Amino acid sequence: MNSMNQIETNMQYTYNYEEDEYMTQEEEWDRDLLLDPAWEKQQRKTFTAWCNSHLRKAGTQIENIEEDFRNGLKLMLLLEVISGERLPKPDRGKMRFHKIANVNKALDYIASKGVKLVSIGAEEIVDGNVKMTLGMIWTIILRFAIQDISVEETSAKEGLLLWCQRKTAPYRNVNIQNFHLSWKDGLGLCALIHRHRPDLIDYSKLNKDDPIGNINLAMEIAEKHLDIPKMLDAEDIVNTPKPDERAIMTYVSCFYHAFAGAEQAETAANRICKVLAVNQENERLMEEYERLASELLEWIRRTIPWLENRTPEKTMQAMQKKLEDFRDYRRKHKPPKVQEKCQLEINFNTLQTKLRISNRPAFMPSEGKMVSDIAGAWQRLEQAEKGYEEWLLNEIRRLERLEHLAEKFRQKASTHEQWAYGKEQILLQKDYESASLTEVRAMLRKHEAFESDLAAHQDRVEQIAAIAQELNELDYHDAASVNDRCQKICDQWDSLGTLTQKRREALERTEKLLETIDQLHLEFAKRAAPFNNWMEGAMEDLQDMFIVHSIEEIQSLISAHDQFKATLPEADGERQAILSIQNEVEKVIQSYSMRISASNPYSTVTVEEIRTKWEKVKQLVPQRDQSLQEELARQHANERLRRQFAAQANVIGPWIQTKMEEIARSSIEMTGPLEDQMNQLKQYEQNIINYKHNIDKLEGDHQLIQEALVFDNKHTNYTMEHIRVGWELLLTTIARTINEVETQILTRDAKGITQEQMNDFRASFNHFDRRKNGLMDHDDFRACLISMGYDLGEAEFARIMSLVDPNGQGTVTFQSFIDFMTRETADTDTAEQVIASFRILASDKPYILADELRRELPPEQAQYCIKRMPQYTGPGSVPGALDYTSFSSALYGESDL
């Protein structure tokens, strides 16, 4: 490798352009005389194929690149083909100097294009020097195939690379960075083809792991469809660590030129299409003008005869139809044609302007379709339209005068017909035959109003007849219908007059009969309503559910019922009088065969209702008698239960109250030994228990009272609930008092308090228990402590209160007071004493063993200690050591155990 670098350093073949700098970028060109074998193979194949792609245009080709260019003839031919210029006439001799002369002509031509050739001489080419021949061909490729490639002012190589990068940017797995490694997988070549000719290759089916297949596919498509010969072997590209850059650039430049030519062709086609589009648009505008002009002229031709028609119509409706058609023409048909005419002129001027701008000859419409021709036809249309409108208005005004009179007839006739509609049917009705007096009187008033209305319409009927006569005289076109209508109105008017008189007579006759019936109905209503109310009230009273709680109340109800029964004969006489009135009404209706109902308009009470309710009253009277007697018997039984319960309750209630007072007094006043007090309280308790049978008997009587639904008892102030509460309170009080004495005995024995001390404590507590309820408030307790010699500050008193009143109730019980005083005056055991005792059992060790506990303590206490003592973990600990210190502290609440 070092020797190769040295050769490259000592032997350099340089070539550059005087004015272009792209040649200075080809520093990768090997300066040594020997090429890398792989690169040489690739360059031979690529350069040979490139040369043949141009020589075939001249009908020839080369087989061996260093041999076929030795005489200079094909070299000169190659330059002529790729440049399009003629070179000097070659020498046809076969001598060496002839060949050198021809090669020099080619080299001179290359130099004339601005390429400076250094160390490349004709002799080396004639001698078949591979290195020099390939270098010369590469120089030609650079000058004629790559030099003209420029993208955004880049050099030839950079421009070609940038073109490749832009074209392949959207494709996956393609990243073109150079002209060697970036092309090894073949996807770059396939992407270039697909970008410009997506119809030739399906890029989505390509596999990056098949580089040889990708390269061969791209080369085959390029050779078959793009006229780019196969210049490389896929195996050489894939298997070479770094493919030859010149070979790749040469092959890729062919794609650039192939697709650049296609883009130029596309530009040319677009230019042609643009010109053709302008021409087609002009032709479309011409055709549209011809079509619009023809349609507009045809419409004018059809419309003018319609406007020139002056045939008059006989009716106003027909003339109004013509006027409406004309207005419809002016409103709907003409405005679009005005727009078409304006648009036609605009299109004509626009078309002429476009033709003038695009250097086309002016447009000449068909004969008769010039803008001036259309304007003339339009003027004739306007003239015909003006005369037609004047004629229409004059004719309409003439018909209006005649139609006004006919319309006046129709309006008056319609008004009269609407008024008269249904009047004959109303007058023929016999609704009064089944109407009430009020309804008949209303019918009479309504009939009087109708007669007034009938008289008022007399003038209208006369006017209708006069107008009909005038229309006949003026020879109105529809006079026959007018006469027929007028005759019907006059005939109907005569009929209405006759029917009106007959209805008045029938209404007045019916009114007199109904007035008689109405007086009877009114009298019935005045007497039936109070009597009906009396029966309803009686039924309510007889069926009323009475609730009484005493004998006096039921006796009062019985007396009221007897008074009610005494009024029944008088009520029956009133009932018969009311029924006779209704019988008189029915007699009148039957006598005159009237179709009215016998129902009374002044009363909702019917005869049948009176009969039914009277029978109901007669049934309820004996039922009420029976109910009242049964209730009287029940009240006598309830009174016996009240007296029986009251007799017992009035004894038990005071007895309980007396016992409560005795217990309360004894708890305060008892003196002497606590055991004597206990015996005395036990005797009290036994006496109370022995009294229980009296409570049970009272409960039985109370049960009977509840079953009888007796809720009050005027014979006693004690209820069963009072007795129960008092009895339970008595039992609770005696039990609590006994418990207090028992607690005092335990406290005395446990704390070593003497009976004298206990008596002093009781005396002090009773003295400061000002309300005598067994409780001292804060102030009383503080005064008690001060009286016993305690000098208390606020903090100390608060501490003591937290001991005697831990729940914050605000009071101190006697037991709490005893507990506090015993703590203050008696010896107490402490955690330190217990710890010292355990230390003795443990032989002064800080821990104790289970065996030692079982040996020194009873089995039950020993097991209790073993189960609850924690393991000892302090200094000198042994297996099974138990911590008696923590255990003892926990017994007195001084530990967290």
From Swiss-Prot:
GO terms for biological process: actin cytoskeleton organization; microspike assembly; muscle cell development. Residues 756-791, 792-827 form the EF-hand domain. Ubiquitinated by FBXL22, leading to proteasomal degradation. The keyword Repeat applies. It is found in: Cytoplasm, Myofibril, Sarcomere, Z line. Residues 1-257 are annotated as: Actin-binding. Spectrin repeats lie at residues 284-394, 404-509, 519-630, 640-743. GO terms for molecular function: actin filament binding; calcium ion binding. Keywords: Actin-binding, Calcium, Cytoplasm, Metal-binding, Repeat, Ubl conjugation. Disulfide bonds: none annotated. Homodimer; antiparallel. Belongs to the alpha-actinin family. F-actin cross-linking protein which is thought to anchor actin to a variety of intracellular structures. This is a bundling protein. This is Alpha-actinin-2. The lineage of its organism: Eukaryota, Metazoa, Chordata, Craniata, Vertebrata. The gene is ACTN2.
